[in-house]
């Protein structure tokens, strides 16, 4: 039989499991694929298959991640599960696996634990927009009051980090029972309930093409008689011939007009998210544009020098620093296509940051970069990656 081509009929959503070690994230992932493939087709993955997560590299950092996919009634899901806590931290900070929503797994027997809290905080910092809770191992708790207490604790913790704790869906079940074929409320029924909630609670994300136009500048050429051409890959939105464009970052913002879009040496009417294009700019001199700036829809993005960020510092084993750094540390921050030097302010009471740590910091850049919350960057020393980060909040 001929291999069937991937039919994208259903909308595609990216999710992942987060939560404390041994609370059942991987078992739940296995249970979801097993039960949903039985109902909607696809390929079931066992615990062992998911647990042997292959290594990937994102922004020069090695991360172990398992990717599974499944379908529900309405959607197609790509789901990530990580073997270790450090992998989650790295995954969320580098944005290697962007999540439209997360399934927070909490053991009903233990309640929220340190990594539960840390993953919720990380989700807030890196901009995971929605969290659904699966209260796992319900077969180990006989006392209904205890379940209620754990549920209250989870809701309080979510609210503390600005998620809507009172309105967050919490599904009570046992991933192991479901995997063993239990058809009861906490078995298969709980997994099917989770699938329904994924469909109804996580809205369809805005596609990259629907956002405001932005393109990081990779290269600039002048073509005699035609003007200046800027090349890059459109990150978001659409650019059409005749559109007004701002050139943002590194120096004062200037306005110009797109007089041509070309791809593979052909002239187009427009370029859109994902396209590698050359954009011809009217009346702009070659030396007015440089790598590291962005072309953007006027007013849609501003240049900033100061922001708070969540960063992960590579361990020595990962090729990072061998020694800690202190307040005032001045590495380069690599945004999109260029490095900008900046200094790091540590939180009150923190003396130093060790290789392998993740921490919230403030950064002051020496030149402004076009940025908004959720933008990823690498931290480098002389071209070598020593960390990764994500903009949590723009300050000025």
Swiss-Prot record:
Highest rank taxon of the organism: Bacteria
Molecular function terms, GO-annotated: GTP binding; GTPase activity; guanosine tetraphosphate binding; translation elongation factor activity
EC id: 3.6.5.3
Subcellular location: Cytoplasm
Residue numbers spanned by region G2: 60-64
Pfam hit, one: GTP_EFTU
Residues engaged in binding Mg(2+): 26
Keywords, alphabetical: Cytoplasm, Elongation factor, GTP-binding, Hydrolase, Magnesium, Metal-binding, Nucleotide-binding, Protein biosynthesis
GO CC entries: cytosol
Residues covered by region (G5): 174-176
Region (G3): 81-84
Region (G4): 136-139
Residue span(s) of domain tr-type G: 10-206
Residue positions binding GTP: 19-26, 81-85, 136-139
Enzyme class: hydrolase
Segments of this protein annotated with the region G1: 19-26
Family label: Belongs to the TRAFAC class translation factor GTPase superfamily. Classic translation factor GTPase family. EF-Tu/EF-1A subfamily.
PANTHER family: ELONGATION FACTOR TU, MITOCHONDRIAL, ELONGATION FACTOR TU-RELATED
HAMAP family: EF_Tu_B
Quaternary assembly: Monomer.
Function: GTP hydrolase that promotes the GTP-dependent binding of aminoacyl-tRNA to the A-site of ribosomes during protein biosynthesis.
Protein name (database record): Elongation factor Tu 1
Annotated source species: Nitrosomonas eutropha (strain DSM 101675 / C91 / Nm57)
Gene name linked to the record: tuf1
């Amino acid at each position: 039989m001929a291999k069937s081509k991937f039919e994208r009929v259903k909308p595609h959503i990216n999710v992942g499991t987060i939560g404390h070690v041994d609370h059942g994230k991987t078992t739940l992932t296995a249970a979801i694929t097993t039960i949903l493939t039985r109902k909607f087709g696809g390929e079931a993955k066992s615990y062992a298959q998911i647990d042997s997560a292959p290594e990937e590299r994102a922004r020069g950092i090695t991360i172990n991640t398992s990717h599974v996919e499944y379908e529900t009634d309405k959607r197609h899901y790509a789901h990530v599960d990580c073997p270790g806590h450090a992998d989650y931290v790295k995954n969320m900070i580098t944005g290697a696996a962007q999540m439209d929503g997360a399934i927070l797994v909490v053991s009903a027997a233990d309640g929220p634990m340190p990594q539960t809290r840390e993953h919720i905080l990380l989700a807030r910092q890196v901009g995971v927009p929605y969290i659904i809770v699966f209260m796992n191992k319900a077969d180990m708790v006989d006392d209904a009051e205890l379940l209620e207490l754990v549920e209250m604790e989870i809701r309080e913790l979510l609210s503390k980090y600005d998620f809507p704790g009172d309105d967050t869906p919490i599904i009570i079940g046992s991933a192991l029972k479901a995997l063993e074929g239990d058809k009861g409320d906490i078995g298969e029924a709980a997994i099917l309930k989770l699938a329904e909630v994924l469909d109804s609670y996580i809205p369809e994300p805005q596609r990259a093409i629907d956002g405001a136009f932005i393109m990081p500048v990779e290269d600039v050429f002048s073509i005699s008689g035609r003007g200046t051409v800027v090349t890059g890959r459109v990150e978001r939105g659409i650019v059409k011939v005749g559109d007004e464009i701002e050139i943002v970052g590194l120096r004062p913002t200037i306005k110009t007009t797109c007089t041509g879009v070309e791809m593979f040496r052909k002239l187009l009417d427009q370029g859109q998210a994902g396209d590698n294009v050359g954009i011809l700019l009217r009346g702009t001199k070659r030396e007015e544009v440089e790598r590291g700036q962005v072309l953007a829809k006027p007013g849609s993005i501003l240049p900033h020098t100061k922001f708070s960020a969540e960063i992960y510092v590579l361990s020595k084993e990962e090729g990072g620093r061998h020694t800690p750094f202190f307040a005032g540390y001045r590495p380069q921050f690599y945004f999109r296509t260029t490095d900008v030097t900046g200094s790091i302010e540590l939180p009150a009471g923190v003396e130093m940051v060790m290789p392998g740590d993740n921490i919230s910091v403030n950064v002051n850049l020496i030149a402004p970069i076009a940025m908004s919350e959720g933008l990823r960057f690498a931290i480098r020393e002389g071209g070598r990656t020593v960390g990764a980060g994500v903009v949590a909040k723009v300050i000025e």
